Regions:
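Non-catalytic, solvent-exposed segments at the cell envelope interface
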Residues: 2-365
Length: 365
């Protein structure tokens, strides 16, 4: 079987104009904790006192420039990566002014597999979850688009492969995992990615457990007889229909499983848990748990959001209603393809994919 014609038709060989954004940096622990929750749906006014109190407790954030990759087209017409290397300078403190911008913000959420089994085998980290979040600060509209990990894309500088391979390639190179995933999405989807935030499996578990677990309404029974377990083993999962209160490890299994359905149902579960986490956080008195959460998340979350942007997004969260958080899917814009070697891919109809992206990123007038 040959892939559909559109499998080999990629976006026009033109680089996406890089958006204006700060250079990637490792944030202070308080910023990491707040960002991870903020992106899970916008926690409104609860975040503002946490931000200010944490800033007083941990001091100012020092910015150290690091390289980031951008896409260029070589004379052969194929995409390659180059590094924008900033001039070295002494770290300088970053203040926390109010944000007065009105431009749309696109944030890439990454769930990263750094399990001991991968480390023991010498394997690089892998992006297990990718969700593109687009926020319009004027209309207060939010769009969320899960990106299936089996999606066949052109990875700049590496050729055609599943999109979740981009993180591993980047992690083994100077481009970094988040940097190469961001460049891959910008090139294939034609959308700028202004920021990223990533959390590893342990960070996700800690977020859920620190919030006291999460309650999810399972729409249909889920059975998975081959869910990955510790020590290169498998375990059997079963989730009955109805309301289920899950601890962190159970919630992680719920969002990762896909043997009983497909990547699109898996993406829907990921969005469902993010929304449930948002509701759980809003119902709790977060100030009582802020320091606990900050300590728990140390080393498990990374982002290039600046503290000033975190504060601005926290203020914006006050005015975002849950009915204005919209979910999107690539289902219907991709088709199944089994390669001769037995590998499975999702092949995109790129005009249809870009139409979905346009619908998510163009707010009503």
């Amino acid at each position: 079987m040959q892939p559909p014609a559109e499998a080999l038709v990629y976006p026009e060989e033109q680089p996406v104009a890089p958006p204006a954004r700060p250079r990637w940096r490792r944030p202070a622990r308080w910023a990491v904790a707040v960002v991870s929750l903020l992106i899970a749906g916008g926690l409104a006014a609860y975040l503002i006192p946490i931000l200010l109190a944490a800033h007083r407790a941990y001091g100012e954030v020092f910015v150290t420039p690091v390289p980031r990759p951008t896409v260029v087209i070589n004379p052969q017409g194929t995409p390659e990566l180059v590094l924008e290397t900033p001039e070295p300078h002494e770290p300088t403190p970053t203040p926390l002014p109010s944000w007065d911008g009105t431009e749309r913000i696109n944030i890439l959420l990454l769930g990263v597999d750094t399990t001991p089994e991968r480390v023991a085998q010498g394997d690089p980290p892998r992006s297990d979850t990718m969700i593109l979040v687009s926020i319009d600060p004027v209309t207060r509209q939010v769009g969320m688009l899960p990106i299936p990990r089996d999606l066949l894309v052109r990875i700049p500088g590496y050729g055609d492969d599943k999109i979740n391979a981009a993180y591993a390639y980047g992690a083994l190179s100077e481009f970094t995992g988040p940097g190469l995933v961001r460049a891959t999405i910008e090139y294939n989807f034609g959308i700028p990615v202004h920021y990223f935030a990533e959390v590893d499996f342990q960070g996700f578990i800690r977020i859920v457990d620190t919030l006291g677990g999460v309650t999810v309404d399972v729409p249909a029974p889920i059975k998975d007889d081959e869910h990955p377990a510790e020590g290169f083993n498998y375990t059997r999962l079963y989730f009955p229909t109805g309301l289920q209160h899950m601890d962190g490890r159970t919630a992680l299994r719920y969002v990762r499983t896909r043997h009983d359905d497909n990547d699109f149902a898996r993406g829907a579960r990921q969005q469902q848990v993010l929304e449930a986490l948002r509701e759980q956080a809003i119902q709790l008195e977060l100030l009582a748990r802020a320091s606990e959460l900050i300590d728990e998340l140390g080393g498990t979350v990374r982002t290039d959001l600046r503290p000033r942007d975190v504060l601005a997004l926290a203020r914006l969260g006050v005015e975002i209603d849950k009915d204005d958080i919209h979910s999107y899917s690539l289902q219907g814009a991709v088709s199944d393809y089994w390669a001769p070697n037995g590998a499975f891919y999702l092949v995109a109809n790129w005009p249809a994919v870009r139409q979905i992206v346009a619908e998510m990123t163009v707010s009503p007038q």
